[in-house]
UniProtKB/Swiss-Prot annotation:
InterPro entries associated with the record: G_OBG, GTP-bd, GTP-bd_Obg/CgtA, GTP-bd_prot_GTP1/OBG_C_sf, GTP1-OBG_CS, GTP1_OBG_dom, GTP1_OBG_dom_sf, OBG_GTPase
UniProt keyword Metal-binding, yes or no: yes
Binding site for Mg(2+): 173, 193
KW Cytoplasm (keyword) present: yes
Residues in coiled coil: none
Protein name (database record): GTPase Obg
Domain Obg intervals: 1-159
Protein's cellular compartments: Cytoplasm
Annotated binding of GTP, by residue: 166-173, 191-195, 213-216, 285-288, 316-318
Species, as recorded: Oenococcus oeni (strain ATCC BAA-331 / PSU-1)
Start and end residues of each OBG-type G domain: 160-335
Gene Ontology CC terms, in alphabetical order: cytoplasm
SUPFAM superfamilies, sorted: Obg GTP-binding protein C-terminal domain, Obg GTP-binding protein N-terminal domain, P-loop containing nucleoside triphosphate hydrolases
Length: 436
């Protein structure tokens, strides 16, 4: 089963409930007047970080999320019930972007963090709200405001203290299964790990930390070869790297350990040079095999020849030799490693990196001409058309006045529209009548 760390979903917040037209019909109230209430607010949609989630697998088959609509208003001026908000759960480390522009909206790294992604529409006003001294009994009401619609891209980057890097079959999955309660799939082929696996290490002295066994890296990963981009996205989120190198001759990769070390570092550098600034420990794996000791000596000599001073820990996950020593060394390194990277990422969760453009407030519009028909293109005018109660003449006349105030009539006349031509706004048709 392939790891799902990206998904594109569509979200539709709830529409506001419709306002209603109603009048008082009570004994001893001869001039009862308007009595129609407002509609309730539509449901908002939030993202919320759930610490129990580890992947975006839930979004493979569920890609459409719709909040409920508000209830319509009632008589006696009663406001309709507002709809419940919809909460969409995502794992920590999820980055939300606009799918159409690829602009980042928010980076969710903190458990329990919630973020409002789509606003529900306000309730339409009932006829009580339109009463004036000159029109004390209006037959005007509004439909509910449409809820926001948005297509977003989700991208998960694993959050862990320690990341295991190395070629496939370097022993990362076996190591993780030995030192944590994680149970990754393990096999003797070169793409052992497809899914990032997280495990928690708990030491006898009370210290603990998380380890991520990430998809195996191959040459060309920084250019997207194999699982490269997926792997490197996750590496960005780790504080300490364990560079796992198979010291045996049974990996089947056909390259020496030092060459493997150089290739992995080159891929990390090509993707982001800052990755090589992370604290790193070289882990010599499979030291229980016959050829490993000699290969390790050659490896150390290559490091010395290039004046590379890097800590090395020898382990065998099969015999569990050296694993405790390695974990203590990692814990000590984490204690000394500033948490600047994490703080920077957490700070970004409080900053709105993307500003929603509210086209509904702009009075700009475009006019398109097809034969004797005219089409008005405008976010705000389309919204007003949706909110117009087209069952009453007064509501339609109010909408016509709004169009004139935006200059639509004048622009249509300038463009050549004649009385009786059909004007289409958001699928609804109106006969054009120019008023002097």
């Amino acid at each position: 089963m392939a790891f799902v760390d990206q998904a594109t979903i569509e979200m539709k917040a709830g529409n506001g409930g419709d306002g209603i037209i109603s009048f008082r019909h009570e004994k001893f109230v001869p001039l009862g007047g308007p009595f129609g209430g407002d509609g309730g607010k539509g449901g908002d949609i939030y993202f919320i970080v759930d610490e129990g989630l580890r992947t975006l697998m839930d979004f493979r088959y569920n890609r459409h999320f719709r909040a409920k609509h508000g209830e319509k208003g009632g008589t006696k001026g009663m406001t309709g019930a507002s709809a419940d908000d919809l909460y969409v759960k995502v794992p920590a480390g999820t980055i939300i972007s606009n799918a159409d522009t690829n602009q980042q909206i928010v980076d969710l790294t903190e458990n329990g963090k919630k973020f409002l992604i789509a606003h529900g529409g306000r309730g339409g006003r009932g006829n009580m709200r339109f009463a004036t001294p000159s029109n004390p009994a209006p037959e005007i009401s509004e439909n509910g405001e449409p809820g926001e619609t948005l297509k977003v891209k989700l991208e998960l980057r694993v959050l862990a203290d320690v990341g295991l890097v190395g070629f496939p079959s370097a022993g990362k999955s076996t190591f993780l299964s030995v030192v944590t309660a994680a149970r990754p799939k393990i096999a003797a082929y070169h793409f052992t790990t497809i899914d990032p696996n997280l495990g928690m290490v708990q030491l006898p002295d009370g210290r603990d930390f998380t380890i991520a066994d990430l998809p195996g890296l191959i040459k060309g990963a920084s250019k997207g070869v194999g699982l490269g981009f997926e792997f490197l996205r996750h590496v960005e989120r780790t504080r300490v790297l364990l560079h796992m190198i198979d010291m045996s001759e049974e990996s089947g990769l056909g390259i020496k350990p030092f060459e493997a070390y150089l290739q992995i570092n080159q891929e990390l550098k090509s993707y982001d040079p800052r990755l090589l600034d992370r604290p790193m420990i070289i882990v010599a794996t499979k030291m229980d095999l016959p050829s490993s000791k000699a290969n390790l000596e050659d490896f150390k000599q290559e490091l010395a020849n290039r004046q590379i001073n890097m800590p090395i820990v020898e382990i065998s996950s099969v015999t569990q030799t050296g694993t405790k020593q390695l974990l203590l060394k990692v814990a000590d390194l984490l204690d000394k490693t500033p948490r600047m990277i994490e703080r920077k990422e957490e700070q970004s969760t409080d900053d709105r990196l993307y500003e929603f453009k509210d086209d509904h407030q702009s009075t700009d519009f475009q006019i398109e001409h097809e034969g004797d028909d005219w089409i008005i293109v405008s976010e705000r005018i389309s919204k007003l058309a949706k909110m117009t109660n087209k069952t009453t003449d007064e509501s339609l006349r109010r909408f016509a006045r709004q169009l004139r105030s935006f200059g639509v009539d004048d622009k249509l006349r300038e463009a050549g529209a004649k009385d009786g031509d059909m004007v289409y706004i958001d699928g609804a048709d109106f006969a054009f009548e120019f008023e002097e």
